[in-house]
């Protein structure tokens, strides 16, 4: 429908639902990037699963042996047998990059967060041009951006590069556009060559 009718859409996704694993989240991110590829405006929201006390969802989460912590953000999902912490961290970094790419100027003609309008879709165009040139999936290219950002943001000691990526959701909502400039994204994508790709 988004593509067919050129709709403005707000889409909410929760990362770490009971029973969800790395492959499930990867497939969802891949699908959503294709879904918002052609829209004129959208907000692709990502939230980390919260184990709120007294909720039915928390009871279901317990059946899946899910672990939550309020160390950084309230009742935040940390890990489960289906999604070990290492896999969750991979999901968080991928999600942060997808959020940064798709929710700010340069992807669609209307920035849903600020309501700004622009004809600038250079990030979207660069992303898909690079994806096609390198014959990658959306998430394979996102993984290349994650690797680049781990190096690029190291000097500023961004939350993104810290081993446990604390405050991940806060980072993608409030810090990603300031720490990851459009110019860096476009240059990084433009400089990727097939022989440089990390496994």
Task: Enumerate the language-model features and the residues they cover.
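Radical SAM enzyme core and accessory elements
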Residues: 78, 85-199
């Amino acid at each position: 429908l988004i593509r067919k009718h050129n709709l403005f859409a707000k889409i909410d996704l929760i990362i770490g639902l009971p029973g969800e694993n790395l492959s499930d989240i990867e497939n969802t991110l891949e699908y959503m990037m294709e879904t918002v590829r052609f829209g004129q405006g959208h907000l692709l929201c990502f939230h980390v699963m919260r184990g709120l006390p007294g909720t039915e969802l928390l009871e279901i989460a317990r059946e899946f042996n899910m672990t939550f912590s309020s160390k950084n953000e309230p009742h935040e999902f940390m890990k489960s047998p289906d999604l070990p912490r290492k896999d969750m961290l991979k999901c968080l970094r991928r999600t942060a990059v997808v959020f940064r790419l798709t929710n700010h100027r340069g992807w669609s003609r209307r920035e849903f967060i600020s309501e700004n309008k622009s004809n600038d879709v250079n990030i979207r165009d660069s992303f898909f041009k690079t994806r096609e040139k390198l014959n990658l999936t959306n998430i394979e290219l996102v993984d290349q951006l994650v690797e680049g950002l781990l190096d690029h943001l190291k000097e500023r000691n961004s939350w993104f590069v810290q081993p446990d990526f604390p405050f991940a959701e806060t980072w993608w909502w409030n810090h990603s556009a300031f720490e990851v400039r459009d110019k860096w994204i476009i240059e990084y994508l433009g400089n990727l060559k097939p022989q440089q790709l990390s496994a």
